[in-house]
From Swiss-Prot:
Function summary: Attaches the virus to sialic acid-containing cell receptors and thereby initiating infection. Binding of HN protein to the receptor induces a conformational change that allows the F protein to trigger virion/cell membranes fusion. Neuraminidase activity ensures the efficient spread of the virus by dissociating the mature virions from the neuraminic acid containing glycoproteins.
Main localization (coarse): virion
GO cellular component: a single term: host cell plasma membrane
Membrane topology label: Single-pass type II membrane protein
Residues bearing carbohydrate: N272, N284, N335, N341, N386, N454, N498, N501, N517, N522
Region (Involved in neuraminidase activity): 228-233
Disulphide bridges: C166-C190, C180-C241, C232-C245, C338-C459, C370-C380, C453-C463, C535-C546
Membrane-spanning segments: 26-46
Cell location: Virion membrane; Host cell membrane
Protein's recorded name: Hemagglutinin-neuraminidase
Segments of this protein annotated with the region Important for neuraminidase activity: 228-233
Any Pfam family hit: HN
Length: 571
């Protein structure tokens, strides 16, 4: 029986069809231009002596048919352009959905009667395939999206099973065919360097009998091999998942103090149970970076590359440090007046990247870039963000939405609102020298933090605080001009609604300037930590759903339990 387990979008030759059709169209248009030129040439060189041009009537008799022919040719060219630009791409998307659906039906139907287990194709229900990693409402939408009630779904996230256990650091990645998920299982307590194992799973979205989505786990692997993987980030790729971790042998503070880089590991886990793990060595990092950490949030698969968000500490006096130390980003809140003049504020913003607590390292954000074709080698590169465009390095997440790249950065420094950027770097030409980003102006949502960088802080200061709480953009956040607020931008997720403590997890929808809709739990003092949100659409019913994963405090089994919450989002 044919194996569909490694099915990917690349297996459908839609790009080839588009290239052939567009080439033929261009050739056709060129032919029309040549014909038109030839006709005009003949008109100019008509033989007057022949008597054909002796009267206005005879001239009209010759020119009129030519004009009518030209009109027909122009109309034909316009129709061809319309078909290429609009009709053909829509039909290709429709055909793609039909093919995926047919493959799934075939695999779970008659073929399952022979050698296959029903439902074993790693592919979402057809209703969700084209509603993933898309903007879910129009760019012009300016309404107030609201959440429906919590939907009772079976949890795909296993919890701790002993009072001393702890599950933490969830990472979730969703692509058109399947999802990948991972978290850390700490065996004693919730300290960063406690001995731990790593849980990794992949699965699909299915439609429940109640007509809402459920997350079905198809494969799991529990990495319990004595390797203390930490801060892991996951990325879904065609046919499987990639896990990026560092190996902890000391505390985070000790990691920054030393110049001996911790071991970095990249693991490939495929639906056919293949598991390949490599220790990676990054060029131009030894002696320049004190520590390199996966940024927890999920990475992306883009143009043949696997990209993971990264942060760490640059060593003073090194080329990388010197390159970035003069750069700083200083967003402004229109309703906040900060102390000091502009020069003093700029100096405070520049110094906010260097943290005394972390041995005066410059805390830097970056992207790990690995060609998927080289998964059997350890060839990857680390590319830094331009610090003139992003805040101090922190945990983060990468997104591909409607073929655009975005980056969420945890607000660990003085700016308390969520940080979201458009990545403007072109990866089609290979690995870039630096990552260029454009901030999406927003003054929401806040996160708890210590003074002087608490939830209402918007003035430059030196601190490292906050909590990871990524956002999901519901429509295109593109500003109308550089650093101008987009009044129609809408996003969703969950945050900890407290000035300084990690308590009161709250679901929200927001614009760039205001919280639009919030709903929390009865106990506003309930302990919580990281939150991660992913929204998608059922293209059959046009309903939008948001999966919001929250580290919830537990008083019974472990300090934290990771809970997936599913809600319908009503525009």
């Amino acid at each position: 029986m044919e194996d569909y387990s490694n099915l990917s979008l690349k297996s459908i030759p839609k790009r080839t069809c588009r290239i052939i059709f567009r080439t033929a169209t261009i050739l056709g248009i060129c032919t029309l231009i040549v014909l038109c030129s030839s006709i005009l040439h003949e008109i100019i060189h008509l033989d007057v002596s022949s008597g054909l041009m002796d009267s206005d009537d005879s001239q009209q008799g010759i020119i009129q048919p030519i004009i009518e022919s030209l009109k027909s040719l122009i109309a034909l060219a316009n129709q061809i352009l319309y078909n290429v630009a609009i009709i053909i791409p829509l039909k290709i998307d429709s055909i793609e959905t039909v093919i995926f659906s047919a493959l799934k039906d075939m695999h779970t139907g008659s073929m399952s009667n022979t050698n296959c287990t029903p439902g074993n194709l790693l592919l979402h229900d057809a209703a969700y395939i084209n509603g993933i990693n898309k903007f879910l409402v129009l760019k012009s939408y300016n309404g107030t999206p609201k959440y429906g009630p919590l939907l009772n779904i079976p949890s795909f996230i296993p919890s701790a099973t002993s009072p001393n256990g702890c599950t933490r650091i969830p990472s979730f990645s969703l692509i058109k065919t399947h999802w990948c998920y991972t978290h850390n299982v700490m065996l004693g307590d919730c300290l960063d360097f406690t001995t731990s194992n790593q849980y990794l799973a992949m699965g699909i979205i299915q439609q429940s009998a109640a007509a809402f989505p459920i997350f079905r786990t198809m494969k799991t692997i529990y990495l319990s091999d004595g390797i203390n993987r930490k801060s892991c980030s996951v990325t879904a790729i065609p046919g499987g998942c990639v896990l990026y971790c560092y190996v902890a042998t000391r505390s985070e503070k000790e990691d920054y103090a030393t110049t001996d880089l911790a071991e970095l590991r990249l693991a490939f886990y495929y639906y056919n149970d293949t598991f390949i793990e490599r220790v990676i060595s990054l060029p131009n990092t030894t002696g320049q970076w004190a520590t390199i950490n996966p940024a927890v949030g999920s990475g992306i698969y883009h143009l043949g590359f696997i990209l993971f968000p990264v942060y760490g500490g640059l060593i003073s006096g090194t080329p990388s440090y010197n390159k970035q130390s003069s750069r700083y980003f200083i967003p402004k809140h229109p309703n906040i007046t900060c102390a000091g003049n502009s020069s003093e504020q700029a100096a405070a913003a520049r110094s906010s990247y260097v943290i005394r607590y972390h041995s005066n390292r410059l805390i830097q954000s970056a992207v790990l870039i690995c060609p998927l074709s080289d998964m059997h080698t350890a060839r990857c590169n680390l590319v830094m963000f331009n610090n003139s465009q992003v805040m101090m390095g922190a945990e983060g997440r990468l997104y591909v939405i409607d073929n655009n790249l975005y980056y969420y950065q945890r607000s660990s420094s003085w700016w308390s609102a969520s940080l979201f950027y458009r990545i403007n770097t072109d990866f089609s030409k290979g690995i870039p020298p630096i990552i260029e980003a454009q901030w999406v102006p927003s003054y929401q949502v806040p996160r708890p933090g210590v003074m002087p960088c608490n939830a209402t802080s918007f003035c430059p200061a030196n601190c490292i605080t906050g909590v990871y709480a990524d956002v999901w953009p519901l429509n295109d956040p593109e500003p109308t001009s550089q650093n101008a607020l987009n009044p129609n931008y809408r996003f969703a997720g969950a945050f900890l609604r407290n000035e300084s403590n990690r308590t009161n997890p709250t679901f929200y929808t927001a614009s760039a300037s205001a919280l639009l809709n919030t709903t929390g739990f009865n106990n506003t003092n309930h302990k919580a930590a990281y939150t991660s949100s992913t929204c998608f659409k059922n293209t059959g019913t046009q309903k939008i759903y948001c999966l919001i994963i929250i580290e919830m405090g537990s008083s019974l089994l472990g300090e934290f339990q990771i809970i997936p919450f599913l809600r319908e989002l009503i525009p």
